[in-house]
Amino acid sequence: GKLLDSVMKRFGIRTLAWNGNGFFVNGKNTLLRGACVHHDNGILGACSFRDAEYRRAKILKEAGFNAIRSSHNPISSHLLEACDELGIYVMDETWDYWLVHKNPYDQANENFLKWWKQDVESMIQTDYNHPSVIMYSIGNEISELGTVKGQELCDEIANYVRAFDETRPVTCGVNLLLAGMAKKGKGL
């Protein structure tokens, strides 16, 4: 047959394990020293440029960090490539909120229920082959986790992530103050 299309994609192979003794990469006990990295590049704005992302990752590595959490959306492909090259581990995060507002101007609303599956699929399909990605976060300080309905949604999202990638753990950030307010039926 005739070649219709081709793609060259770098990927990495490594083993990850967690147990009562810690986190292990390729059998070696590994302590994570991490930072939250927002998607902006200072004066460059929210654009992602390879050189800027590599520079940022290199500065973090030289400062002693070996891990980052994307705050609070999936990480750019340029930053993931830099983390792959420099040996920086990544917690790949989806959202900052689901349905309950953290401030009057955020995007928390019922549309979350229509789009979360597509967001999860897109992130995992894009980032799966990056060895730097060691885990997924399905939310940052999610208020709904203070409610039974929120906990059920968390389980549903986590299981959906695992259906696409059972090799990496899934976590979700909890803010007990916001969760307590949500439990009482209050949001911001």
Enumerate the predicted regions with their spans.
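Substrate-binding/catalytic cleft of secreted carbohydrate-active enzymes
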Residues: 54-62, 67-188
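N-terminal carbohydrate-binding accessory modules
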Residues: 1-62, 81
